[in-house]
């Protein structure tokens, strides 16, 4: 996989984006370069911007970035923080610059925003809609250094991805994670056998690459903290167990 998770030149292009009058919160009467916001001298305490307004304190941001980097190093884990809350390529760059492996996102439009510099995205959702598949493959074909790891939990989904990749003529295989799910919940393979069936289909499909297994432990949480901790601690073992069956 590509070793550079971020492209500073693509991020710099955002500085040239023109903000138009009517942009929420900004007191501008003429178009303004986004990169010029910092020299306008605006002060929220003087009500120069409309409310509500969110402020980021750089010292706190640097502290949080450093703390999370050291936490991951101490525990020997890699992190792809979820970007759907901030939707800020500048913050994505700061996270990647502090050791993040990539950025997690939930929708294809979010992936399109992240491509302003982000080189590696985990799309933590089923990629099944034809328009979404077409958009992701177009991004990959346009930029050979861009990586997008997607999910699948069904044979039908694998077939759809494989057919689309073949039609697109990608130079590299599309990495796919098998999603592990929970009975009665929103997505994912319900059993180990189902997960292994999907995994074998991915591994045997031209144009696809079996990248591993993943799941969302948040759906395990109840109001019983002790039981929740046990369940969440055990959940990664399911993914590891599925992976060992594939060796």
Language-model regions: role of each:
Residues 86-88, 108, 126-128, 151-157, ...:
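Active-site beta-loop-alpha junctions enriched in small/polar residues
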Residues 78-80, 102, 120-122, 147-149, ...:
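Structural preference for beta-strand elements that scaffold enzyme active sites
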Residues 66-76, 95-97, 115-117, 136-145, ...:
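Acidic (Asp/Glu)-rich catalytic clusters
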Residues 58, 62-69, 92, 111, ...:
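Generic structural signal for well-ordered alpha-helices
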Residues 1-138:
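A charged N-terminal "starter" segment
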Residues 181-247:
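Active-site loop/helix belt of alpha/beta enzymes
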């Amino acid at each position: 996989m590509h070793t550079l998770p971020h492209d500073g030149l693509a991020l710099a292009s955002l500085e040239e984006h023109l903000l138009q009058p009517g942009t929420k919160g900004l007191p501008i009467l003429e178009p303004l370069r986004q990169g010029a916001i910092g020299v306008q001298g605006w002060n929220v305490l003087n009500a120069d911007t409309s409310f509500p307004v969110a402020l980021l304190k750089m010292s706190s941001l640097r502290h949080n970035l450093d703390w999370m980097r050291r936490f991951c190093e101490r525990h020997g884990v890699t992190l792809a923080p979820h970007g759907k809350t901030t939707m800020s390529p500048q913050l994505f760059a700061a996270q990647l610059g502090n050791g993040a492996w990539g950025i997690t996102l939930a929708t294809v439009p979010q992936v399109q925003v992240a491509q302003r510099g982000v080189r590696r995205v985990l799309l933590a959702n089923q990629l099944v809609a034809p328009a979404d598949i077409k958009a992701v493959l177009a991004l990959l074909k346009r930029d050979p250094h861009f990586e997008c790891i997607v999910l699948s939990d069904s044979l039908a989904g694998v077939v759809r991805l494989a057919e689309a990749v073949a039609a697109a003529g990608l130079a590299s295989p599309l990495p796919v994670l098998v999603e592990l799910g929970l009975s009665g919940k929103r997505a994912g393979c319900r059993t180990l056998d189902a997960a292994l069936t999907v995994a074998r289909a991915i591994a045997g499909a031209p144009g696809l690459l079996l990248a591993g297994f993943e799941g969302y432990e948040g759906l395990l949480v109840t109001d019983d903290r002790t039981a929740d901790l046990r369940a969440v601690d055990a959940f990664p073992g399911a993914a590891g167990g599925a992976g060992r069956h594939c060796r």
